[in-house]
């Protein structure tokens, strides 16, 4: 740790405490993520270390840079680029109103970051406003990319805060174990709706069942016809048959018709029908200047 000076605590992350730090040589401000390792563990699994070291190669302006991996017996510290705030805090400062040009800019940057990582076969798996960081220039960056694969997604953060289900797709809620890039596209859709509504979450479920109910009340309950194989997923439960809503303008009133079209292409229950990040970036919502 000699290379970095620890400054004040920024907060609690999913995997441990986050501190503001300073590179003693360059004086650059960084974020130090102390990954809490299990007491009875053998230290850091070599597979996790390999995964983490691969992430140092992910260099893109919409991805939070991982500069360094500091590893000692019981401690693993990840040194990241520092950003001023996360999207959750940004929402809190909005007082319920967002400029739709900002909504569009953030969404495009989110998709660019996702497309880059997906092209390198790296999934996020736990996208939410808390790990989308924003700097003073209005640049949005994705944080904690690839960490879910290295460490797993805990059910509770070690600070005992429950990991949110609000951005999880129905296939994962039903116990699907084969993750593809589509998991991140669902989360991106939830975040898009939240952006368009100035920080009000689209599906704020209290538990897995409530989460599924909130989703299906909007999108309709899936069947074997609409989603072949859904009833064979390990945690599948039969739920009341809700029809899909017809008017998305009630769900996201501020979003233009093209924006609503993009949202509907992201929020598809059947994973292989969700649009990819690359495809979503080409959507007319981003090219039509009259779009707000």
Swiss-Prot record:
ATP binds at residues 10-18, 33. The active site is at residue 126. Keywords: ATP-binding, Cell cycle, Cell division, Kinase, Nucleotide-binding, Phosphoprotein, Serine/threonine-protein kinase, Transferase. The keyword Chaperone does not apply. Residues 4-286 form the Protein kinase domain. GO terms for cellular component: cytoplasm; nucleus. GO terms for biological process: axonogenesis; cell division; neuron apoptotic process; synaptic vesicle transport. It is an enzyme of class 2 (transferase). Probably involved in the control of the cell cycle. Interacts with D1 and D3-type G1 cyclins. Possible regulator of neuronal differentiation and/or development. This is Cyclin-dependent kinase 5 homolog.
């Amino acid at each position: 740790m000699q290379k970095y000076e620890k400054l004040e605590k920024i907060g609690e992350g999913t995997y441990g405490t986050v501190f503001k730090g300073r590179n003693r040589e360059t004086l650059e401000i960084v974020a130090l993520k102390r990954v809490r390792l299990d007491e009875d563990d053998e230290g850091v699994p070599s597979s996790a270390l390999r995964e983490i070291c691969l992430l140092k190669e992910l260099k893109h302006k919409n991805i939070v840079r991982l500069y360094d991996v500091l590893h000692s017996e019981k401690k693993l510290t990840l040194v990241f680029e520092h950003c001023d705030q996360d999207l959750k805090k940004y929402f809190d400062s909005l007082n319920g109103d967002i400029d739709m040009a900002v909504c569009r800019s953030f969404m495009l940057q989110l998709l660019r970051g996702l497309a880059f990582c997906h092209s390198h076969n790296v999934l996020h798996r736990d996208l939410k406003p808390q790990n989308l960081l924003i700097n003073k220039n209005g640049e949005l960056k994705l944080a904690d990319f690839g960490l879910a694969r290295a460490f797993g997604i805990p059910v509770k953060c070690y600070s005992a805060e429950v990991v949110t289900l609000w951005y999880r797709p129905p296939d994962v809620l039903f116990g699907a174990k084969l993750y593809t890039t589509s998991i991140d596209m669902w989360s991106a859709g939830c975040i898009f709706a939240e952006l368009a509504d100035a920080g009000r979450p689209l599906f704020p479920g209290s538990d897995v069942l409530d989460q599924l109910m909130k989703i299906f009340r909007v999108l309709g309950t899936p069947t074997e016809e609409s989603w072949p194989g859904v009833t064979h997923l390990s945690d599948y439960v039969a739920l009341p048959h809700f029809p899909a809503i017809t008017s998305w303008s009630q769900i996201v009133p501020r979003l233009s018709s093209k924006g609503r079209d993009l949202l509907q292409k992201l929020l598809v229950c059947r994973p292989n029908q969700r649009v990819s990040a690359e495809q979503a970036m080409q959507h007319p919502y981003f090219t039509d200047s009259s779009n707000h």
